[in-house]
């Protein structure tokens, strides 16, 4: 499936495809198992978006024409079903006034592309989950349903992070693992939750969430930079091949002094954060330039006055 298809397909239709094409499936999770099963990387992404009919009843109404600004800049548009996509072919951006959902359909595209283009002996496991946006039910199901298969994995890599170069560690992974991931061109950043927060600790493996090119997630201003998406896919391809060759099981060793939340609590200073006064969402101060000082949850403007003291 190409990225346009994944950004426009209804979740129920995607589920029907995954039930037929995956090796094993549950109610909210779908696992692709490689032919060679030992010492493999597992890729993770989630199929649900905040724009699913079941999770967002006030979905924006479909629009059928470009704005005057879009027309004047010669942007391309395509309509699939009830969804309008606007493409900036020069910049490689995709946007939708109906809600884009690149969080995390861009990740789904990335992991499926890697699955289909990396031959053995390097073919990864791929785990696709549902309901990440509402608490991670698919991830909880996966750790029970695929316990035997996922125990073979050396690490977990999720493609579900905004931006271009971020690598996020949720479980206080040790510095050696973080340095290894960064050697492929990523830069450590802070995040709060993704499916690997649930999955990796169950198997005592290190895990990372990588940027996949979307911005302003969970808002009507979300867009996808497809060039950055493809760069992450290329970097991840190199990472998978190298990690499979090394066949090292990256066992999780909690390091409370690293970014994130370890057994002894957070090591972040309050002054590293900004909290939205409207909805309470918490942000890392260094991300403000990228976010244009706008809350991605409620779109309120953020201010240095909201920095913890």
Feature names for model-found ranges:
Residues 1-42:
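A non-catalytic alpha/beta surface segment that caps or lines the substrate-entry region
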Residues 37-123, 135:
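Active-site metal-coordination/substrate-binding segment of hydrolases
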Residues 98-181, 188:
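Acidic/histidine-rich catalytic neighborhood of metal-dependent amide-processing enzymes
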Residues 187-232:
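Zn-dependent metallopeptidase/amidohydrolase metal-coordination segment
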Residues 216-274, 280:
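His/Asp/Glu-rich mid-to-C-terminal helical/loop segments that flank catalytic regions of hydrolases
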Residues 277-278, 296-297:
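Short, cysteine/histidine-rich loop/knuckle motifs that typically chelate Zn2+
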Residues 280-283, 302:
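Cys/His-rich microdomains that often coordinate metals
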Residues 285-294:
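Short linker/helix segments within small regulatory modules
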């Amino acid at each position: 499936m190409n990225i346009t298809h994944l950004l426009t397909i209804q979740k129920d239709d995607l589920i029907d495809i995954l039930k037929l094409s995956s090796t094993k499936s549950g109610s909210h999770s779908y696992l692709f198992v490689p032919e060679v099963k030992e010492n493999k990387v597992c890729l993770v992404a989630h199929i649900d978006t905040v724009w699913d009919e079941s999770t967002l009843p006030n979905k924006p109404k479909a629009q059928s024409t470009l704005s005057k600004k879009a027309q004047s800049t010669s942007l391309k548009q395509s309509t699939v079903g009830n969804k309008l996509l606007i493409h900036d072919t020069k910049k490689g951006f995709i946007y939708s006034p109906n809600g884009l959902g690149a969080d995390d359909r861009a990740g789904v595209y990335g992991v499926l592309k890697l699955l289909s283009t990396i031959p053995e002996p390097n073919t990864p496991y791929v785990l696709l989950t549902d309901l990440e946006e509402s608490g991670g039910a698919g991830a909880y199901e996966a750790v029970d349903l695929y316990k035997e298969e996922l125990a073979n994995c050396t690490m977990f890599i999720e493609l579900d992070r905004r931006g271009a170069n971020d690598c996020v560690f949720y479980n206080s992974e040790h510095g050696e693992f973080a340095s290894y991931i960064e050697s492929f061109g990523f830069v450590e950043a802070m995040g709060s939750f993704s499916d690997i927060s649930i999955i990796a600790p169950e198997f005592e493996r290190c895990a990372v969430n990588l940027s996949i090119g979307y911005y302003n997630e969970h808002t009507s201003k979300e867009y996808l930079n497809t060039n950055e998406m493809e760069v992450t896919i290329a970097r991840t391809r190199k990472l998978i091949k190298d990690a499979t060759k090394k066949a090292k099981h990256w066992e999780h060793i909690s390091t409370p002094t690293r970014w994130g939340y370890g057994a002894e609590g957070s090591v972040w200073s309050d002054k590293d954060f900004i909290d939205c006064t409207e909805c309470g969402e918490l942000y890392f101060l260094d991300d403000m330039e990228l976010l244009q000082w706008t809350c991605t949850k409620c779109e309120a403007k953020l201010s240095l006055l909201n920095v913890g003291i």
